[in-house]
């Protein structure tokens, strides 16, 4: 892994035929193994920046690398090195919690025994083991959010993007999430 897990130089992103400038020359460097937060008011472009760094959007101009790979020219390599939990939980409500995590692992071409063990571990870590075999449409909003965060970790990515990770979590779940993040950072996750 390079010295910087994430580097961005003069990122500009416009919408509505160039009339709305969501990002205007953002540059940043995130050292490998460090926690980095984007702070700003609503509508300041934080989510847009995360979407660019995770290859969901392309910048209008500027350049960025994640794990040493260009987000525009090498999006598949970037995706192999990241986990992403967006602002809203994106779980399949017709699958169980376990099936959601297993699906993510298999889509990442991970071997089945690893996926089963990792899914069970994450369900336990996020306080969802008792609900592992329930259809997720029966989950509360906070439970869905925790499952979404767990899904971002199935592939044990070296870089993790969390967009407002504590939204919808109760105080105990927030504390538990920060403890998990601390353990990940201690293990080298950026």
Model-derived features with residue positions:
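Catalytic Walker B motif of ABC-type/P-loop ATPase nucleotide-binding domains
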Residues: 160-163
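Walker A (P-loop) phosphate-binding loop of ABC-type ATPase nucleotide-binding domains
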Residues: 41-45
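Helical segment within the ABC ATPase nucleotide-binding domain
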Residues: 175-187
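Conserved catalytic motifs of ABC-family nucleotide-binding domains
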Residues: 156
């Amino acid at each position: 892994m390079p010295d910087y897990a994430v580097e961005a130089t003069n990122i500009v992103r416009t919408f509505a035929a160039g009339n709305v400038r969501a990002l205007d020359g953002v540059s940043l460097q995130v050292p490998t193994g460090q926690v980095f937060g984007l702070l700003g008011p609503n509508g300041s472009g934080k989510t847009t920046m995360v979407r660019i760094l995770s290859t969901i959007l392309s910048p209008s101009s500027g350049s960025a690398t994640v794990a040493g790979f260009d987000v525009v020219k090498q999006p598949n390599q970037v995706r192999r090195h990241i986990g992403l939990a967006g602002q809203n939980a994106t779980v399949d409500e017709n699958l169980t919690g376990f099936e959601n995590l297993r699906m993510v692992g298999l889509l990442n071409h991970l071997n089945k025994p690893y996926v089963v063990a990792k899914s069970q571990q994450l369900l336990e870590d996020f306080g969802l083991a008792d609900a592992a075999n329930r259809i997720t449409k029966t989950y509360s909003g906070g439970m869905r959010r925790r499952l979404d965060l767990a899904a971002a970790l199935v592939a044990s990515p070296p870089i993790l993007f969390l967009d407002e990770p504590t939204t919808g979590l109760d105080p105990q779940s927030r504390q538990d999430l920060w403890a998990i993040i601390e353990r990940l950072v201690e293990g080298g996750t950026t």
